[in-house]
Every structure is written in C-alpha cells, then in structure tokens.
Design a protein with these regions (language model features):
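Generic recognition of long tandem-repeat/solenoid scaffolds
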Residues: 63, 173-175
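Active-site glycine-centered loops adjacent to acidic/histidine catalytic or metal-binding residues
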Residues: 113, 172, 202
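A short coil-to-beta-strand element that immediately follows conserved catalytic motifs
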Residues: 103-104, 164-169
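N-terminal lobe of the biotin/lipoate ligase/transferase fold
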Residues: 2-156, 224
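Glycine-rich, flexible loop/turn motifs
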Residues: 117, 170, 212
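Long, positively charged amphipathic alpha-helical accessory segments at protein N-termini or as interdomain linkers
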Residues: 1-36, 45, 56, 137-166, ...
C-alpha cells in the first residue's frame, strides 16, 4: 500500500501516557516504552504536525490540545488514513485485491470522490469519507443488502445527536429533505458468490455544503467532534453488519 498514515503502537501508547498525567517527562516515556528520548521527541514532533498540541516544558511534555481526527491509533479497527486521495474506493479496491478485509480507508479530502450512478461526491475537509472492505458470504446479487445496516447505523447515531433523519432504499440519508450522507457499494464476484464488497460512505459533518445539502454542523449550529463521531459510527457499523449479514 502506497503512502498514508498507518497505526503506530508508539503513538497510541504515547498519547495514553500524556492523557494520564498533566506532565510526563521524556525519560519516563522512554523507559516505559523502551525507546530512546530522541525517538520520543520525533513522535511528539510528528503528532504536533498532525494537529495535536504537545508542549515541551522543563518538567516534561504536556498535551494541550487533541487533534480530534480519526487517526488509526485512535480507533480499534485496522485503518489506512490519508490527508488527500483521488478516491478511497480506489485504494479499497487495491487492498481488496491483495486479500484484505474488514479494513477502513479514511481520507480528509477526495479529489474524485464518487457517489451512485457515477455522480461526484464533493469531499472537502471536515467531513467523514471512508471505504470499508468486507467479504460476507452472500451472493453477488444480494450485495445491496449491505446498504441497510450501514444506513441504519448512521440514522441511529444522528438520532442520538438529536437529528431526525430519513434513509431511502439506495442508501442516501436525508434531513429535512436535504442530503446529509450517502452510501456507494462496489463488488466483485460470481453470481452465486461474492468475492468482496467495498462500502463507500460520505457523511457531511463539519465540512461546507451547498444549500441543497446539509451537515451535522449546520443542523446543530456547532462543530462536531469528528473523532468521537467516527469512533461510534465504526462500532455501530461493525455491530449492524455482524447482526444482519455475517
């Protein structure tokens, strides 16, 4: 797989320690993790470049601000994370052809994000754009059955945010007749056996949207914690897929 941001056990543990205490010394972090202080400094520098604010003080490191982005080390799933791609669907297809399954591909922005019927899906920063590779034991003709558990998970979470949403059979999610999310499914296989399916999802969260669409931010009048939204959605998607398909 080319490029992208992959999971980092070091960053995962480093953030865990920084969240435990107000100040953590470089020596303490290095000893706990079995790495050098230089390695600690390098990871701190990388995290700062990714949107976290970690200050260095005479007593040690202090986590001032979270990035609130769904980086791989913030989630309990296998995730490939990209700042910008042409389409997460294309990367998902590459991974599927390599034999991957149950893997999420997330992008902050897409240059060629696509929706149903070849339509363009505008993918500006602030939204949630991802593809999921799955290999359910169903026939190719039944692949559309994957839409319902995904759309159900989205509607369920929106309801918890106080947003009443309606899902249509093609997977689009509407709020007050304005589109908030969409689902695209592409698959490979034989008539009686699905080799793999790629579920593409776009959710307008904090990103700017045209007047005919809407977003969580527009509906609620405030910015949403994108990491928390993603974390809960992925858990719900996993639950709904396991319950209805696998």
């Amino acid at each position: 797989m080319r490029g992208g941001i992959r999971d980092s056990p070091v960053k995962r543990e480093l953030l865990k320690q920084l969240r435990r205490k107000d100040v953590v010394s470089g020596d303490e972090i290095a000893q706990r993790m079995g790495i050098s202080r230089v390695a600690v400094w390098k990871h701190i520098k990388e995290l700062n470049m990714l949107g976290y604010e970690i200050f260095s003080t005479p007593k040690g490191y202090v986590l001032i601000r979270e990035a609130y982005k769904p980086y791989p080390w913030e989630l309990d799933f296998e995730v490939y994370y990209f700042k910008e791609v042409w389409s997460t669907m294309d990367i998902a297809k590459e991974l599927a052809e390599e034999g991957k399954e149950n893997v999420f591909i997330i992008a902050e922005k897409q240059k060629g994000g696509r929706g149903r019927l070849g339509r363009n899906w505008i993918s500006q920063e602030g939204g949630l754009y991802f593809s999921l590779v799955v290999r359910p034991k169903i026939s190719l003709k039944d692949v559309d059955k994957l839409v319902f558990p995904i759309s159900s998970a989205i509607v369920e979470i929106l309801d918890e945010y106080g947003i009443s949403a309606e899902m249509v059979s093609n997977g689009d999610i509407f709020v007050r007749n304005k589109k908030l999310a969409g689902i695209l499914i592409e698959a490979e296989g034989e008539i009686d056996l699905l080799e793999y399916a790629i579920i593409g999802v776009g959710v307008n969260v904090n990103n700017p949207v045209p007047e005919e669409a809407t977003s969580l931010k527009r509906e609620l009048g405030k910015e949403i914690n994108l990491l928390e939204f993603t974390r809960v959605l992925f858990l719900r998607i996993n639950h709904h897929l396991l319950k209805t398909i696998f």
